[in-house]
Each structure stands twice: as C-alpha cells, then as structure tokens.
Amino acid sequence: MLPKIFYLSLLPAALGHPHLQPRLDNGLARTPQMGWNTYNHYSCSPNETIVRSNAQALVDLGLASLGYRYVTTDCGWTVADRLSDGSLTWNETLFPEGFPALGKYLHDLDLLFGVYQDSGIKLCGSPPDNVGNYEDQDARTFASWEVDSLKYDNCYSDAATGYPNVNYEPSTSPQPRFANMSRALAAQNRSMVFQVCEWGIDFPARWAPALGHSWRIGNDIIPHWRAIYRTLNQAVPQTSFAGPGQWPDLDMLFVGNDILSIPEEQTHFSLWAILKSPLTIGAALKDDETSINDESLQILKQADIIGYNQDSLGVSASLRRRWTEEGYEVWSGPLSGGRTVAALINWRNESRDLTLDLPDIGLQYAGTVKNIWDGTTAQNVKTSYTAKVQGHGTILLELQDTTASGQYPGDTFATSTGSSTTFESIYGVTTSFRYNITVKLSEASSSSDVKIQSTASNKTITAQVSASGTEASAQIPLLAGSSNSITIVSPQSVDAITITPPNGTYFPNTAFTTIGDADTVSCGAGYCQPVGSKIGNISTNGTARAVIPATAGTKYLAIDYINNDVAFDSAWDWGSNSRNLTVSVNGNKPVRIEVPLSGQHSELFGPGKGWWDTATIGVLTEGWKDGDNDVVIGNEGGESGFTSYGPDFVGLRVL
C-alpha cells in the first residue's frame, strides 16, 4: 500500500483499538440518526406551530421516507421554574397543546420525538434552573412522554467556576454528568437515542460511546463557509472511533439556510455524510414565512449520499492527502459490497479541473466511477480520474469493481507486440530507484531472465526468473506521478505486474538540530511515537534542520507531527484546528501544509494533554539532489496569519 495519512495507536495493547471502545448497545442508532432540529434557524425561540409545520414538511417533501425522522425541539421550550414536584414542563404559551400531544402528533406522522435538556444548572439560552439532581426524574418524564431521543447539552455546568454559561476548560471532566443521565435513561422501560453534546471537551470519543449514541466532536457550527474546514480538521483524529451505535457528530446541517452557496452546501452535506455524522437538518423546511429552496432540498434528498451515510459497514471516511497551497484534499472510506467512496474538496473559490490519483485512496483501477454531483459515470478508470469542480465544491465519487494500488493486470494496463509488453499509467508516489516490481508470467519460462525498461531511466534492468519459472522480481526507477510506463521483454506473455513503493529512510527529530526558539521535549513512555520525543516551538523564530542524504528528484515525505491546538473560543471566529508547517529543501521555496489535529486524548486531563499523540501526513517536495540535502522544518508564513506556531515535529520518512 502507498503511504497515506494514518494514526498511530497510542493505547497500551491491553486496551485495544479505538474501534473497540465500550459502547452503549441498546439496538438504537445502528446507522447515524437523521432528522430535523429547530436550533439552526429558530435558535432558542421554537413554538408548536413551527415544529408541527416543519414535521409535516418532512413528510410532504419526501424527506421522512429517506430517513429524516427524528424531530427535535431544541432550547427554548421550557419555563423558568419546574413544577412543584420538581418535574420539567413546557412553556404553555409556545406549546399550548403540550409536549405529550406534540409527541403523539409526530408519532402519528411516523416520525420520532426528540427533546433537549442540559447537564448544567440551566439550559443553554433558556430556563429552567436545574440546581439539584433531576436526571432520574427527567428520564422518567421523557419516557412518560414517549420521547425517542434526547440531545443533552453542556451549558452552566462547571461548579468550581460559578457555573458560567460556557467554560471550555472546566475543572473536572463533563463525563460524570453525562454518565448520570445515561444511567437514568437506561433505567426506563423505553429506549431513547442519547446525543452527548459536550462540544468536544475532554476528547469525548474516548468516553462518550459508552454513554450515548453520538458525541459532538467540537464547538457549534457557525453560519460561515470557514466552519466546514474547522470542523473537518477536528474530525480527523476521531474518524476511527465511528461505528454502529457510536457516531461522531459534526453538528447540524446548514444546508437550506441560504448561508452557503450550492457548491458549498454540496461539500458540507457530502463530508458530513461520508464521515458518518448524524444528518440533522437545521433549515426551515416550511413555516408561515419560509420554505426551503428546491436546490438545497435536492441536496438533502440525494439518495446515493444518504446511502453512504447509512451504509451497513459503518466505517467513516478518513483524510488521505492534503495539498494546502494548491487548495484541495482527498477523503475516502470503504462501503459495503467492496465499494469505495471518495471526496475531492476544492477549497479555492474558483471552478477548475482536479485529478484524483486512485493510489492516494488505496486503489489502482475502478471498473465504474460514479460522479454524484455532475451525474456522470466513467468506466475502466486506470490510476487517475479528472473532473471539473465548482469553487468550494466537491467531486464525490463512488468506485466499484476496484483493484488495490500497485496491482496492474495486463489485460487492463498493458499492450503487447511480439515479446514486448508495455504497461501504461504506472503511478509513483515519489521519485526513486527503489520500487520493487514483480512480473507474473502466463506460463513457466525457459529463459533465465526478463528485461525491464522504465521511462524514468534509459537503463535496461535484468530480472532473474524465479525457480518456478513464472515470476521475476527487480528494483526499478519511477518518477513521482501517474505518467510512468514500463516495458517488459519476455518470451512468455506477461499476465500482470505488482509494484510496491520503497520503504524509505526514517529521520527522527533527534537527527535534527534546533535553531532559535525551537526545542526538544521528551514525552511519556509509549508516546510521541515512534521516537519518544519531539521538537516544539516551531515558529518564524524556531526551526529544525538536518542534512539528509538522498537521490535527486521529487520526494514524498511522511511527516510525523503532533497538533492538539483545539479551537474552542476561536471557533466563533477564525479558529481552524490546524497548524502551519513548512518544509524547505536546499533553500528552495518551502512546501506549506496546514496539518489537522492529531490528539486522541483529553486536552485537559489526558497524557500530555493530547500533545503526545502522533499523526502522519504526506507531502511532496521538490529540489532534492544526489548526495547531502539541507532540510528545514519551519513555519514560514506564520507571521502572515496562518498560525504563530507550527505543530510539534516527531520525525519524517523520505521515500
């Protein structure tokens, strides 16, 4: 397999993989929940007419039949005080027929009844005061109302600091408060979906699956395009925790709120869906003043994309490659039936052609490539796929009948003339003379060798035929890119070739010299993998430098970094959950990449506060020469508003 973005497991072996975290398993949310919520459009000012009108619209517009069934009234439905017996009640002015009647109305439409409550002393943006222990009583109330789901928020919850509306650095973990309500709900004779809404505090992916069916990965989505990038950067280290009954919640959808352009809405919906987020509509579908526009409605009704979200395999897509300066990136993941979904995001606000190299998502060939947003289908796609995409839009693809990367069947990739067979569309992740090729012959050869010629070199390579007479192996050169070709001369016909990239050479941070403010930091045992230390304070005044021997050409670097600079307060502004990293080779123009979060432990209480968790990201670099190369890891451009500090640097592998 070619190098890709991946996350090192930092758990002790006895604790297992994140996929195997204990989870609440009551048969609900086997796929991500879908529905509608009042908050994004109506804020904390819902009423009975609004909820009923939009619920009816779910049915009338054909959304309910596609799976959008949970109808949740968010903040603003309660009154200032509980009843004399301590139980919750609704605001009779806003909901004159009451919540039990609202639930019956929804159930009669074959919809599901969702309510909202808070783990603090009052609800976000609305009463009542909740001082005391009301979880058991509230759970009984919700069960008696025949509630189907509960969104449980996190406002006014930190006693040690006087219960402020919001505290992103609480004195204790929010986990016990959510655990109390989880236990209370479990004690009822009615199963309810429990949505943990802790805003990403204390890295809930480690504890929320045991308590609820979904957890908010970060702060609220805001009505701006930049919120998409910020949210995806926070999702990166959490995708491996997704699975049946435990879903990372990227927050409600802004599709249909007349805030994003149509291509932006397509990107928003596509990525929320393939990352297996709950799909909760936040737009006004139909009320006395508003109805959703048809283009946005068709996005919400895109059946293929809903199918990816609800796929029985239940595996989230993950970030595979990012090109910051070029303004695009690739996410992909597996689907049931051996299919693959891939999203190529155009971060630039201009229409252009973009190319997906299939090996970046682990594939070499696809018999069918379905382009969802432009409605076309391509057949027999070899190595690369190119399509036009609008500014801020996404090329969303479903790939079927695929071949794994590095596998080149002759009947697909080759043409033969006499004893010569030429394979086209050969992909190289890096420029190197150390690719390993295995030639598979159709029958045993009487010859002792075959001749191999790569367009990356004018030299002919002789490969010895194995004892079986059906295979020959050698090392060959390839250039970075998808335009290589290989010609094989053999008296026997060639069935296929297999090519694997070089392992490369690893250079830990200890091989680098720190300059200026940059410094080396030791980590706890088993962390900052695979080195056990890192270089921090990388900035415009702090760099790490090493002399690295290599051959000439364009080189792929697999960079081990650490970033747990979580955007909480800054999420309301320009916080992006990313840090800026630059790599300069031999004084050439640096390659810049904004790396996402890597932390998979609590930013408050976890080992190293999440700053010991390594991730790997790939970047292609120019300017390498034969012999020694001067390599500088820095943060050029940080002073221009990217980020003041780069991520911490663990090491890199040169392929």
UniProtKB/Swiss-Prot annotation:
Keywords attached to this entry: Carbohydrate metabolism, Disulfide bond, Glycoprotein, Glycosidase, Hydrolase, Polysaccharide degradation, Secreted, Signal
GO cellular component annotations of the record: extracellular region
Subcellular location per the Swiss-Prot or TrEMBL entry: Secreted
A GO molecular function held by the record: alpha-galactosidase activity
Positions of glycan attachment: N47, N91, N180, N189, N349, N436, N458, N503, N537, N541, N580
SUPFAM superfamilies linked: (Trans)glycosidases (SSF51445), Glycosyl hydrolase domain (SSF51011)
Record-annotated active site: D153 (nucleophile), D220 (proton donor)
Cleavable signal peptide: 1-16
Reaction(s) the record says it catalyses: Hydrolysis of terminal, non-reducing alpha-D-galactose residues in alpha-D-galactosides, including galactose oligosaccharides, galactomannans and galactolipids
One GO-annotated biological process of the protein: polysaccharide catabolic process
Membrane spanning residue stretches: none
Enzyme class: hydrolase
UniProt: substrate binding residues: E198, W199, G200, I201, D202
Superkingdom of origin organism: Eukaryota
CDD domains to which the protein is assigned, alphabetical: CBM35_galactosidase-like, GH27
Disulfide bonds: C124-C155
Pfam families registered for this protein in UniProt: Melibiase_2, Melibiase_C
EC code(s) of this entry: 3.2.1.22
Family: Belongs to the glycosyl hydrolase 27 family.
PANTHER family on file: ALPHA-GALACTOSIDASE MEL1 (PTHR11452:SF75), ALPHA-GALACTOSIDASE/ALPHA-N-ACETYLGALACTOSAMINIDASE (PTHR11452)
Function comment: Hydrolyzes a variety of simple alpha-D-galactoside as well as more complex molecules such as oligosaccharides and polysaccharides.
This protein's name: Probable alpha-galactosidase D
